[in-house]
């Protein structure tokens, strides 16, 4: 089977447009999510070499990305290297933790220092 999974970044049209623009410009080369979401959704953790269709707010594929590195770390241990690759905020791990704790809380997820986070680095094909 040659089907690829889809990936949607951001939870509003405006935020998704912003994040997708960063991906297409080569400034966003990573994304993160809570490991428990994969369990809740019955989805496997992303794996190196896996391809994803990047969707816009209408659900239309705008690019294909491939996972180049996948790590699972405690929220408190997300490194600056990842924050830089993610391309958001001031590009520091401290800003990553602050902004993502707020963003995820808005979606009902209260992140803790030991919450397991999947870090996926990727490139656009």
What are these regions (language model features)?
Residues 1-64, 68-125:
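Mixed-charge, low-complexity intrinsically disordered regions
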